[in-house]
Amino acid sequence: MAAVEDAVLVAGGIGSRMLPASAVIAKELLPLVDIPAISHLAREAVEAGAKRIHIITSPNKDFSNIAGDNSWASGKRADIAKEILSPFCDVDVFVHVQHVARGFGDALSCALHSIDGPFMVLLGDNILLDTFSGTRNYVASNASKRLVEEYEKTSLPCVGLSAVEDPENYGVVAMNGNLVKEIVEKPNRELAPSNLVLCGRYVFTEDTKDLLSKYSFEEYGELQSIAVQKHWMENNGLIGVELDGFQWYDSGAPIPWLKSQIDYALRREDLQGSIREWLEDRLQR
């Protein structure tokens, strides 16, 4: 069985819900307090075993600074861990441009000519954290590692799942044991098969490229990736990995991102005291 050594960071969307901010800075570069969102994803991928990271971007986005060597900044802030200043420092980086926004499946197609074997996928505006360390003693998320470990046991494609209170806003799954039996896109709440939803983490198998050709964008549109996952469900199987114990932060819209900032700051040991004191004072006014 081939090792999972490639990770695809999907960061091509225009971020319309985050305009006007996303007109000048990619939503994937927005900081969760002081650490860019994409830095969390890069370190998570490395923690899971990635040796090559493929960034799917659009023509108007530039990730060259974050993907480069920022060790020069250590002279200014020696307290910041090297892997946070230069989060891609220990992997090979490939940038692939999706010239026309045609959905998740088409975005993956932009990178697959450079990938042999299974690969991780991380959606660029979704951060999943199970530790809340600061910039001095940063500890990467284990979310993708959990999926890779499941793939290594089964050789089957895997999707990360999170329990939510508003499943009508997501792709919701019906499960049979650890197997995904159905994915329902944004169902009415009363029709949702569960409260488990896709949360932007995947391990896909090496047949993905052929399946994206079989279930083409021209026929399936932006549901192309769902058609591929349905193929796996109906054949050898698609594993659902519940990522309990993780906080899910979303940089794709203002209110969720603001809530993310506050929640994350309240969980960080180096910030929680001062931010809690300020919040308590502010809420009393």
Regions found by a protein language model. Give the residues of each.
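Conserved catalytic core of nucleotide-sugar-dependent glycosyltransferases
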Residues: 168-182
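A structural signal for short hydrophobic beta-strand segments in well-ordered beta-sheet cores
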Residues: 29, 173-175, 240
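Short catalytic helix/loop segments, enriched in acidic residues and glycine
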Residues: 23-39
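Short N-terminal binding/cap micro-motifs at the start of the first secondary-structure element
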Residues: 15-20, 168
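Short, conserved catalytic or adaptor-binding loops enriched in Gly and charged residues
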Residues: 81-92, 150, 175, 231-233
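Conserved N-terminal catalytic core of the sugar/cofactor nucleotidyltransferase
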Residues: 2-9, 17, 35-122, 128-129
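Catalytic-core segments of class I nucleotidyltransferases/pyrophosphorylases
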Residues: 133-140, 144, 148, 179-277
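Conserved donor-nucleotide/metal-binding helix-loop-beta segment in metal-dependent transferases, i.e.
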Residues: 130-167
